[in-house]
From Swiss-Prot:
GO terms for cellular component: catalytic step 2 spliceosome; nucleus; post-mRNA release spliceosomal complex; spliceosomal complex; U5 snRNP. Pfam families: WD40. Keywords: mRNA processing, mRNA splicing, Nucleus, Repeat, WD repeat. It comes from Schizosaccharomyces pombe (strain 972 / ATCC 24843). The gene is cwf17. PANTHER family: U5 SMALL NUCLEAR RIBONUCLEOPROTEIN 40 KDA PROTEIN. The keyword Repeat applies. CDD domains: WD40. This is Pre-mRNA-splicing factor cwf17. WD repeats lie at residues 48-87, 91-130, 133-173, 175-214, 217-256, 267-306, 308-339. Involved in mRNA splicing where it associates with cdc5 and the other cwf proteins as part of the spliceosome.
Length: 340
């Protein structure tokens, strides 16, 4: 693993002020507001990437996060204490489009515009393997959280592929008519949700390679999908400038669309802006091309509009154990901030 030198101060976290639009209260170091996390300070901005940051995700323990983007590198960061970029993973020949952690936090997986998936040992920084098989940009990646650690990926080549993380070879391919841009795998590993440029979200049953349902409502490209913690709801984002929740429980009613959230927008960059559930699934978050992070209650109320970035916010993630939100941007920076 490449390590940052101590002199590279630009990779450290810096205290910043961030305004909650709902009540315009400042959250600053020494604020009288009750602290809600173990962060050293309520809000930090991290520097280190040399190009647009497209994705950032916490590891399952919540002690670390990884970020990647157009500079073809994955940066590894501490969350608590003196927040620093402690390692750099190199090897992809194209932009890092998505990344995931293994459930034991020892492996980092990524998808890339170079048509491959890659995995690294997050402790040693050693490359583990490269997964080859896609014939176009790999836009998104998800990992099964229980049982065998399966990977799912979708690509501009109009296919969704399933991989055994222990092998280089693809174990299943599903072909669609249009390029695919988003994927999420159900907790039990029998269903995969995929979205593409046609605006439809399809539920594929991996046991019989059958599309069991199509979730309709979006009118433009699906940019991100995420399953709720209990597996009952699917969160989606689209270039139609809406974020939606769908009921994906077995034998759900015909009207599966539960919520529509508005506010977050997609701009001329046409980046695949991400969405995320909070740790208790009470809140959802999304990036926006207007440089803000949007957070809603799952019941539909807009709770926060968080400024600070100077470019499109491409991805957000919630901490698995504390009230902390992570965001990354085309401005090459990353924010860590607590929610109160």
């Amino acid at each position: 693993m490449d390590k940052r030198k101590e002199s590279e101060s630009a990779t450290n976290g810096h205290l910043v002020k961030r305004i909650r639009i709902q009540d315009s209260s400042l959250i600053t170091e020494g604020s009288v507001l009750q602290r809600t996390s173990d962060l050293n300070v309520p809000n930090l901005q991290m520097f280190g990437h040399t190009a647009e940051v497209l994705v950032a995700r916490f590891d399952p323990s919540g002690s670390y996060f990884a970020s990647g983007g157009m500079d073809r590198q994955i940066l590894l960061w501490n969350v608590f204490g003196d927040v620093k970029n402690y390692g750099v993973l190199n090897g992809c020949k194209g932009a890092i489009t998505d990344l995931q952690w293994s459930r034991d936090s020892r492996v980092v997986y990524c998808s890339s515009s170079d048509t491959h998936l890659m995995s690294w040992d997050a402790v040693s920084g050693q490359k583990i393997r490269k997964h080859k098989g896609h014939a176009g940009v790999v836009n998104a990646l998800d990992v099964l959280k229980v049982g065998s650690e399966l990977l799912t990926s979708v690509s501009d080549d109009c296919t969704m592929k399933v991989w055994d993380s222990r092998s280089k070879d693809c174990i299943k391919t599903i072909e669609e008519k249009y390029p695919l841009t988003a994927v999420a795998i159900a907790q039990q590993g029998t269903q995969v949700f995929i979205g593409g440029i046609d605006g439809a979200i399809k539920i594929w049953d991996l046991r019989n390679n059958h599309c069991s349902h199509v979730l309709k409502g979006h009118k433009d490209i699906i940019t991100s999908l995420a399953i709720s913690k209990d597996g009952s709801s699917l969160l989606s984002n689209s270039m139609d400038n809406t974020v939606r929740i769908f009921d994906v429980k077995p034998f759900a009613s015909a009207q599966r669309q539960l919520q529509i959230f508005e506010g977050a927008i997609h701009g001329q960059e046409h980046n695949l802006l991400g969405v995320a559930w909070s740790r208790n699934s009470r809140f959802v978050g999304a990036g926006s091309s207007d440089k803000n992070v949007y957070v809603w209650s799952a019941t539909g109320d807009l709770r926060y509009v968080l400024p600070g970035h100077e470019g499109s916010v491409n991805h957000v993630d919630f901490h698995p154990h504390q009230d902390i939100i992570l965001s990354c941007s085309s401005d090459r920076t990353i924010f860590l901030g607590e929610l109160n």
